[in-house]
């Protein structure tokens, strides 16, 4: 199974229009040097079984960037919570300016399913409306990069620069789409394990990076004792980025220095 680096942001659709979320997210990618490449529609072939058991069809398209943004917006609006949305998804494909060491480039070019290192620079962006325990609904903005090449193989200094690029994207996304919460982590921790902890007043130690917007911060009061191993960065709107550096205590340099 391909290893991905995952990042998700939760946006309140009553506070930020869906059109602005899609446009803001795509603008954020462009702002850090990403290039739009294509779209992919994924559809479950057999909707009578759980999605994890179904076979899927994948249709790649190459519309213009503006057409892709329009289609992603219509797709988000057309899949309300409780619909059969889980059986269809729509991805926007971008190419990020990740760095690869020469040994990794050779590895990628020798890979039977890759042959070209630019394939490992490809990332996916998608949007879905979902239920939320604190709000009625939330828009989930989902970003994925190819973790095993971007962060695992090659020189640690190269990995660090690639991760800093992803964090630049995270801040650009945060600034443009105004989420109340977000998380980012590697393939072995590729799910949100911190939101419920924050709502319960516990420190979000499960994910490497957590983003707390001003609305959520006001709701929970940030009376959470973060404890050792978590450092914070304040954002211009009063939000915070929490970095669980205790996960990788020897990683240098630190991200918030």
Predicted regions: what is each one?
Residues 154-155, 185:
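A short secondary-structure junction signal
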Residues 1-47, 51, 253-257:
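Short, extreme N-terminal segment that most often corresponds to the first beta-strand
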Residues 29-37, 164-183:
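Structural alpha-beta junctions
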């Amino acid at each position: 199974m391909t290893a991905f680096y995952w990042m998700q942001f939760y946006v309140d659709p009553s506070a930020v229009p869906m059109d602005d979320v899609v446009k803001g997210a795509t603008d954020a990618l462009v702002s850090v040097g990403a290039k739009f490449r294509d779209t992919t529609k994924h559809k479950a072939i057999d909707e009578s079984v759980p999605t994890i058991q179904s076979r899927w069809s994948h249709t790649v398209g190459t519309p213009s960037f503006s057409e892709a943004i329009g289609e992603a917006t219509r797709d988000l609006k057309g899949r309300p919570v409780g619909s059969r949305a889980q059986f269809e998804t729509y991805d926007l494909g971008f190419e990020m300016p990740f760095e690869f060491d020469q040994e990794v480039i050779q590895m990628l070019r020798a890979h039977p399913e890759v042959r070209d290192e630019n394939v490992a620079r490809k990332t996916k962006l998608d949007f879905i409306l979902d239920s939320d325990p604190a709000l009625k609904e939330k828009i989930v903005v989902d970003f994925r990069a190819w973790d095993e090449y971007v962060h695992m193989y090659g020189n640690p200094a190269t990995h660090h620069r690639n991760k800093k690029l992803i964090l630049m994207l995270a801040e650009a996304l945060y600034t443009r789409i105004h989420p109340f919460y977000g998380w980012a982590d590697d393939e072995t921790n590729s799910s949100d394990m911190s939101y419920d902890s924050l709502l319960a007043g516990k420190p979000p130690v499960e994910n490497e990076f957590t983003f707390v917007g001003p609305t959520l911060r006001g709701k929970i009061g940030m009376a959470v004792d973060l404890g050792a191993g978590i450092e914070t960065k304040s954002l211009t709107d009063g939000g915070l980025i929490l970095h669980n550096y205790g996960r990788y205590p020897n990683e240098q340099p630190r991200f918030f220095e």
